[in-house]
Amino acid sequence: MQPSIFIAIPNLGYIRTELALTLFRWLTSGKYRLKIFMPMYIQPHHRARNVCHREFLKEDYEWLLFIDSDCAPPVDGLDRLLSHNVEIVGGVVLTWKDGAPIPVALRKKGEGYVPHYGTRLEEVDVITMAFTLIHRSVLEALPVGSFAWGDFPDGTDGLGEEFVFCQRAKERGFKIFCDYELLVGHRKELELLEVNQALIKGG
């Protein structure tokens, strides 16, 4: 039986060309039953993800695959995620923070979270939704609205919607994984001075 996947790509009217080409390859491969849902101009991020959650539950697909519009997963990325047969799994998506690239896959440490640098398939506490596959059982167990911004007590900062969703999923007993061999392109603007400083520090 073909895997059935509801692909959700929230966007602001643009997706990467590389992502469009990968979607075309998946659609024409005949390997999957796919639906692509691309809600535009819904902000903030947690609202867009909750819309995707709601629309997914109206359909009969087994999996929801979130892809960020500025990401470029490899063509074999979907097969890799499916092959793990776990409830929540994503690839490695890097972001730039404090002058260094870090994976958006984290483990809890004390009262906060720290990036986790793993190998192969490893369990984490939080993973970005930039390229993440979620089984229907998770999305049926969690109410629509489970993606939410979590404010810090003093209101000066907060946790993004992925943190809150992952916390709620773990509270329901679901495990979260990152495939550290699945590298996903992520287009980000950054200050090249920071790159230069990082190279000097590392050299």
Q: Where would I find each of the regions flagged by the language model?
A:
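C-terminal catalytic/acceptor-binding lobe
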Residues: 1, 145-203
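N-proximal low-complexity "stem/linker" segments adjacent to membrane-targeting elements
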Residues: 1-43, 47
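Alpha-helical elements of Rossmann-like donor-binding domains used by nucleotide-donor carbohydrate transfer enzymes
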Residues: 21-25, 51, 80, 164
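Glycine-rich phosphate-binding loop at the start of an alpha helix
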Residues: 46, 50, 75, 163
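Active-site nucleotide-sugar/metal-binding loop of Leloir-type enzymes
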Residues: 50-63
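Conserved catalytic core of nucleotide-sugar-dependent glycosyltransferases
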Residues: 53, 74-151
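Short beta-strand-to-loop acidic/aromatic patch adjacent to the donor-nucleotide binding site
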Residues: 60-72
